[in-house]
């Protein structure tokens, strides 16, 4: 009996099956961001059950991969670390400790599962993972939008203060659709080494504008246009003339990205200090308000939530979806929790 189980596990623990399970896992995450649970109450429970089955498979695959590792080789590599590598290793250790602390203090398992999934994904080639996620996202996007267009999934319409209607087309919030389109453009361009023909760039532009008119997602429009300009400059060889500038931005991004959580917190608190203490007619206050307007009132919104709820070193157990649709709040005015965390959900 035990031998049969081992044989069965060996048959299913293959790279092809592993990527298929990753695709199923990613698909359940996408479904969680749709209005499926609005129409079918048990959908969220079924997706959660499927994810736990995927986690079991993840564990089996990780254990198999760990057994095949040459630990002595890794020990030798660690001995030859330079200062930069030791610094990065230290950051990784701090991050792991923080994730454990977050779990213990808030009982929030999301970061643990995210780390678990990243470890599992590292068992495969990077391009294979990208291709799997791209295919899953592309098929899911077509399926969800089609079902919504046919009336089989709820099209949640969110209205801005000025009356602008924002369609979600099957997703829980309008920005999800525009973000997925943006990511698909990035995925496809990456697969083509960012060498895109003018005709396809024109199709990109039409798609971006069309989605903007449906969702009125301004941030995604601006980011998508910046991506489009960069792809155009890469395709035409213009970026090659500015190698030093490109390298500067690459290094700046790698330095600034890990500092973003701390930096954004400092900026929000500084805005709060200016908002509460500075003269409303002063130049500093006007600059702060202008910056807040550029970020669609996010600085004030986040500072107000900090003031109302407080904050802790290792985070709080909050719902990752801030304004997303549920049966109970479709017609209600929902306040954000700490951050505009529907963007955070995309990262997960």
Give residue ranges: language-model regions.
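Aromatic-enriched
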Residues: 32-44
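Hydrophobic transmembrane helix bundles of membrane-integrated enzymes that assemble
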Residues: 9-33, 47-71, 76-282, 307-310, ...
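Long extracytoplasmic/lumenal interhelical loops at the membrane interface
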Residues: 285-348
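Intrinsically disordered regions, especially transient/low-confidence alpha-helical propensity segments
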Residues: 3-5, 22, 288
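Short, Lys/Arg-rich, polar N-terminal cytosolic tail immediately upstream
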Residues: 1-11
């Amino acid at each position: 009996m035990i031998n049969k189980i081992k044989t069965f596990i060996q048959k299913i623990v293959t790279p092809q099956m592993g990527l298929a399970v990753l695709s199923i896992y990613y698909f359940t995450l996408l479904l969680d961001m749709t209005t499926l649970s609005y129409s079918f109450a048990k959908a969220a429970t079924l997706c959660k059950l499927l994810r736990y089955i995927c986690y079991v498979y993840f564990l089996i695959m990780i254990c198999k991969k760990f057994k095949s590792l040459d630990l002595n080789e890794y020990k030798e590599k660690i001995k030859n670390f330079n200062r930069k590598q030791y610094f990065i290793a230290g950051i990784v250790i701090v991050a792991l400790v923080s994730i454990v602390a977050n779990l213990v203090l808030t009982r929030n398992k999301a970061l643990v599962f995210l780390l678990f999934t990243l470890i599992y994904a590292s068992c495969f080639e990077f391009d294979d993972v990208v291709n799997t996620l791209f295919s899953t996202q592309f098929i899911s996007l077509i399926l969800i939008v089609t079902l919504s267009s046919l009336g089989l999934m709820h099209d949640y319409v969110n209205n801005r203060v000025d009356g602008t209607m924002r369609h979600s087309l099957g997703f829980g919030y309008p920005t999800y659709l525009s973000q997925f389109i943006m990511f698909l453009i990035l995925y496809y361009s990456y697969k083509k080494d960012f060498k895109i023909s003018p005709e396809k760039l024109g199709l990109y532009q039409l798609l971006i504008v069309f989605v903007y008119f449906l969702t009125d997602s301004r941030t995604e429009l601006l980011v998508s246009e910046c991506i489009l300009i960069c792809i155009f400059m890469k395709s035409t060889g213009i970026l090659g003339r500015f190698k030093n500038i490109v390298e500067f931005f690459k290094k700046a991004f790698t330095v600034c990205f890990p500092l973003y959580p701390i930096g954004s917190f400092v900026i929000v608190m500084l805005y709060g200090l200016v908002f509460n203490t500075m003269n409303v007619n002063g130049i500093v206050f006007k600059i702060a308000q202008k910056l807040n307007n550029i970020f669609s009132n996010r600085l004030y919104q986040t500072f107000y939530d900090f003031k109302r709820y407080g904050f802790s070193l290792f985070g709080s157990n909050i719902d990752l979806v801030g304004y997303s649709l549920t049966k109970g709040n479709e017609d209600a005015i929902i306040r954000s929790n700490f951050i505009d965390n529907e963007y955070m959900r995309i990262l997960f």
